[in-house]
């Protein structure tokens, strides 16, 4: 099927004189996860991961993806003729290096300019400006092949009440306009769905598990133009927007609107989130400031109301996770449980709380060697039945009106080897070491990542991903500019100074291909610690509360401070979660939060 699609794509390319065609993962807004309409890269390659770029030439094809997906991509591409390029690995060509090698004098490089960001687009422009290589950005060639392509979402939007958001739309606009004035901008084009959701306190269902609305906002110093499918807006939204001067326009009208921008305007935009076609439609005599959206940092630093809500929703999430662990541990070997039925049970427990309206991403439920694929997705064909042996990794989260959660636990279902216990305990040690870090203000995740990775590096083991990511508020489960990783990855934009109020995950892991995978993940709020003289120290507050499976822990591998932290953490889990459990669950929880 994939080879047939590639053949048809190449026929179309030949007819149009195209030598190479780029198919990224993004939608028109550079979203990480996308709606079904935008899954062109998945359609042409069969690779289902959330990140990757396909390049097709008339002779060959390649997929570039990151370390989270190496194992999965190898499996999904094996019969496709598409070559896997492992991004970030030594000696592996980047997309740009590959194109420079294969494109010849007179060739044409093409892509849909709506799904490539402006920075990438003008990067290609600059690269090939002095070479005889043409760039065409008006072709959506996949649309021609995809006969039963899903339509764009028509789901309704809703306003997020200020009791959850903590700030009014007007107050947020005032903050954005203050930054615009500082930068001498008269207009700001905001194309990131997550930033628009934060700024306008609007949420929707246009991307599975990510409550955003397909839209673009243009902010001037006294007005806002909001480009959206108006059918998605209810009367409450229209009334609120009308009251504060937000003018609603057709979603696709933005491309013509920007053509009319006057030359005396100074436009602020972020070239990594504005798409290339939108950027190219702005008249060339208009001054452009290409800089991060002001909302990028505003939404990352949670306000006091958001933090209060986030803490509350993590208790609810912890109750669901604890009930799930009880169900799993007491039923394994007694009833049939599969990777999918376990995932379904957890979703049922989460959604039993009326505050939970969705998952924050498709649950990763990986048993045995499946857990070595960081973002494994079980299917009816691939799923395993769980037995009283080995380990089950479950990475999951919920969308609550009070916040977004992300938690991973690895459960011991029976006998495991001493090596697996060493791996499990080392992952736990790394998670603990980062959790209890004290550091000077000015540190970035780059400075702290080794705390989590250190126990594994001591064993000669690494994991091919960051240690943690920022997390949105009733928004995308992955959010910058905060994160933990050991080296700078510019396109991730997640290595900022850690500020008070930022929420970041802490999730070291071990992934042994063909054998097992282990990950333990909590969320952390960055907060001020003591000030000593002129030195402001910072620390983390752990906000995730669910038992860590002690059946995988060998205390002999831990130092005293790590054991003290774990015992204190489990006492807090019991104190916070037990009031919401039945009698049997409470008795069971005593055993799984015992001091070691």
Feature locations, PLM:
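Active-site neighborhoods and metal-handling regions in enzymes and metal-associated proteins
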Residues: 1-596
């Amino acid at each position: 099927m994939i080879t047939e699609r590639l053949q048809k794509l190449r026929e179309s390319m030949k007819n149009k004189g195209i030598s190479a065609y780029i198919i990224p993962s993004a939608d028109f807004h550079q979203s990480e996860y996308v709606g079904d309409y935008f899954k062109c890269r998945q359609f042409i390659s069969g690779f289902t991961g959330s990140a990757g770029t396909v390049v097709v030439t008339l002779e060959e094809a390649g997929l570039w993806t990151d370390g989270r997906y190496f194992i999965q991509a190898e499996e999904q591409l094996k019969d496709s003729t598409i070559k896997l390029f492992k991004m970030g690995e030594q000696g592996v060509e980047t997309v740009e290096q590959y194109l420079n090698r294969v494109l010849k004098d007179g060739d044409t490089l093409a892509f849909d300019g709506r799904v490539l960001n402006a920075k990438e687009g003008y990067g290609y422009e600059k690269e090939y400006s002095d070479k005889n290589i043409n760039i065409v950005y008006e072709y959506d060639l996949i649309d021609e092949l995809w006969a039963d392509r899903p339509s764009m979402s028509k789901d309704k939007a809703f306003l997020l009440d200020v009791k959850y958001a903590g700030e009014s739309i007007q107050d947020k606009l005032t903050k954005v306009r203050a930054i615009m004035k500082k930068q001498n901008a008269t207009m700001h084009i905001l194309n990131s769905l997550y930033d628009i959701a934060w700024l306008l306190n609007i949420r929707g269902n246009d991307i599975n598990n990510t409550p955003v609305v397909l839209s673009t906002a243009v902010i001037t110093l006294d007005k806002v133009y909001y480009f959206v499918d108006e059918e998605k807006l209810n009367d409450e939204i229209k009334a609120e927007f009308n009251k504060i001067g937000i003018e609603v326009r057709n979603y696709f009208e933005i491309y013509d609107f920007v053509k009319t921008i006057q030359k005396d305007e100074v436009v602020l935009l972020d070239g990594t989130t504005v798409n290339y076609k939108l950027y190219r439609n702005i008249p060339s005599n208009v001054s452009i400031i290409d800089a991060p959206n002001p909302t990028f940092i505003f939404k990352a630093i949670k306000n006091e109301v958001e933090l209060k809500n986030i803490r509350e929703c993590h208790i609810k999430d912890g109750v669901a996770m604890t009930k799930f662990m009880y169900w799993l541990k007491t039923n394994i070997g007694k009833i049939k449980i599969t990777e999918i039925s376990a995932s379904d049970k957890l979703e049922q427990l989460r959604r039993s709380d009326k505050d939970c309206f969705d998952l924050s991403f498709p649950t990763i439920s990986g048993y045995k060697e499946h857990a070595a694929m960081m973002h494994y997705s079980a299917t009816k064909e691939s799923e395993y039945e769980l037995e009283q042996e080995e380990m089950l990794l479950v990475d999951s989260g919920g969308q609550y009106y009070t916040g977004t959660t992300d938690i991973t636990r690895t459960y011991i279902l029976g006998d495991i080897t001493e090596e697996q216990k060493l791996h499990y305990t080392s992952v736990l040690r790394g998670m603990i070491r980062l959790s209890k870090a004290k550091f000077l203000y000015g540190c970035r995740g780059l400075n702290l990542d080794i705390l989590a990775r250190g126990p594994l590096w001591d064993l000669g083991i690494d994991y091919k991903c960051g240690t943690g990511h920022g997390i949105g508020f009733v928004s995308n489960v992955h959010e910058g500019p905060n994160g933990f990783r050991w080296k700078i990855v510019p396109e991730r934009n997640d290595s900022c100074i850690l500020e008070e109020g930022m929420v970041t995950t802490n999730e070291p892991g071990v992934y042994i291909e063909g054998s097992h995978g282990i990950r333990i993940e909590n969320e952390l709020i960055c907060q001020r610690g003591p000030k000593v003289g002129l030195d402001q120290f910072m620390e983390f507050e752990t906000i995730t509360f669910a038992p860590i499976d002690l059946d995988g822990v060998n205390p002999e591998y831990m130092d005293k401070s790590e054991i003290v932290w774990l015992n204190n953490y489990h006492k807090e889990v019991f104190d916070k979660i037990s009031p919401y459990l039945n009698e049997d669950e409470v008795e069971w929880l005593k055993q799984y939060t015992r001091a070691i």
